[in-house]
Amino acid sequence: MGALRWLSIAATASTALALNPEGLISAPRRSEAIPNPSGDVAVFSQSQYSFKTHKTTSQWNVLDLKSGDIKLLTNDSDVSEIVWLGSDDSTVLYVNGTNADIPGGVELWVSDISDFANGYKAASLPASFSGFKVVTTDSGDVRYVAYAESWANGTAYNEELVAKPLSSARIYDSIYVRHWDYYLTTRFNAVFSGTLKKSEGKGKATYKADGDLKNLVSPVKNAESPYPPFGGASDYDLSPDGKWVAFKSKAHDIPRANYTTAYIFLVPHDGSKTAVPINGPDSPGTPEGVKGDAGSPVFSPDSKKIAYWQMADESYEADHRTLYVYTVGSEETIPSLAADWDRSLDSVKWADDDNLIIGVEDAGRSRLFSIPADAGDDYKPKNFTDGGVVSAYYQLPDSTYLVTSTAIWTSWNVYIASPEKGVIKTLATANKIDPELKGLGPEIVDEFYYEGNWTKIQAFVIYPENFDKSKSYPLLYYIHGGPQSSWLDSWSTRWNPKVFADQGYVVVAPNPTGSSGFGDALQDAIQNQWGGYPYEDLVKGWEYVNENFDFIDTDNGVAAGASYGGFMINWIQGSDLGRKFKALVSHDGTFVADAKVSTEELWFMQHEFNGTFWDNRENYRRWDPSAPERILKFSTPMLIIHSDLDYRLPVSEGLSLFNILQERGVPSRFLNFPDENHWVQNKENSLVWHQQVLGWLNKYSGVEESNEDAVSLDDTVIPVVDYNP
């Protein structure tokens, strides 16, 4: 049996303010804190949406790394990126998102943070470039890389300069046809390189563009970097000496929709040679049997090595991520590090030429670990951070790290840590700064473990405003997507458990079979078990809550989930557990087994169900929420959300479910966004999403009556289409 890990403040009343949807969506959103070379200050961006003006404002701030004080650097909304330039503690290169000469282009400006408004233009770029990485060479010149969309001929794509075609037709001879939320074209993402020439003069040196941009990706047919939809600047790196660029691309020589295989390419910064993969099928150092996805290439400080991660399985997107270190120019087999460790890394950086720092998901958190660059496969890395989820980390001159993280109780937390001392000092945290998050703290979260179907399962517990253990609160059962994913101790603007809890629930968020960060065995066991082991874990979790927590009212409980969590809600609707809930919410869940073939990343379904749709159809139908015998059990009121741009799980899945619920006479509602994908990101749409989801749950759980401030379905001003007689 598990035990709830009580925190000292959790059982007492607090003066915390309820976190409501408007506060969540309109609270400031901040980027990682990027330190200057001396480690005195760091810069970060901040954006904030207003429901009064219906606009987003943005700014850049400076964080003092000694005092924690924050001051405004600029509120110019056209400044989209800032990077420190050279070893100077105050000179920065920034991206101006507009271009005075080229519509749709951007400009590079150089400025001093002590007089930011009086910088100068160093370069005019012909398209919308982003993800800048910069090094200063021995000559003083600046070399950089960035990415943009590219035409097939290698020139950068500029949407504002393109003539609209006369026909809207699209023609395909291979897959993908569409991916995530867009239809493929002949364009692709590419990494470009450029140089800023240093000129000495009176006062500070100045920099100006030198030569043309070089497309480093287009010479390799079918290569693309960063790889959409989630690729970004972590997909490539520039060596500290400015001579080399490493980038990730999906394998260019096999069907991209059927395999996860990716290569790390190496190319001179000047593009004088065509990029070659260091881990491709013909590369001399490729480890035997390693054919899966790869990523996060990063050069060592001496530019002689590249660290990266790679999976072995070419059809499993959540396979174990093993760390590798390649020596530039070597033909020896690329060695793996800590390959036997039962955790997958998310990110990697070099501490020095002999040691690395890796970010790793671990037991509901994302932590930092240190590891020697020559570690054997049996090495167990050492953790030096604890709670929350690390989103960025930068080494300071004293070998400590400036860490940016989030937690369930804060959207932004900046602190200093080191492998030797752990967390040393907290500099800033959003719940102490933002009125919208006032009163939030680690006391709002607990966790417990319970016996699942075959192993112990972890679950988070999130308490409502002014929680009182002597009272009773309806259960909100939270089911995550993936399925190889997990609920983390992290902030979310889409599925924030505290917003749900503050309506008047105790949120329980289990990490059942299939969840990541608890070892490969738990994660991998979901294969061909979508409605099996995880469902049984959830049943046992509900039973454990029902038997052990008097302050949780399971009689009036509700459940919600998205993506795989949406599938599970659909599965629960036709299962005995479905009768334990007063209402259900299914967001973008798969419903009809035979419709799985309409997804885009075919490797996913083929791995999850042990074969293709035509060779092993029974496995696809084994866990079919739309099976007739399951439909006959549907009775719990259900809200279905599905959007038109969701090409991962097409909108027809949600419509099919809604049709059946309506014909069966089950209270149901369909919420659709024509301009959203698998996620709801537009701020106004997000508000409607929260109003409808919370309003639906509150209506059937009784929270609407017990909490006068609870969200109601009537809060949404969008008219409801209803042709019932």
Swiss-Prot record:
Subcellular location: Secreted
Cited InterPro entries: 6-blade_b-propeller_TolB-like (IPR011042), AB_hydrolase_fold (IPR029058), PD40 (IPR011659), Peptidase_S9_cat (IPR001375)
GO MF, any single term: aminopeptidase activity
Chief location bin: secreted
GO CC field: extracellular region
Annotated catalytic residues: 563 (charge relay system), 646 (charge relay system), 678 (charge relay system)
Glycosylation sites per record: 75, 96, 153, 258, 383, 453, 610
Enzyme Commission designation: 3.4.14.-
Protein name as annotated: Probable dipeptidyl-peptidase 5
Top-level taxonomy: Eukaryota, Fungi, Dikarya, Ascomycota, Pezizomycotina
Recorded name of the encoding gene: dpp5
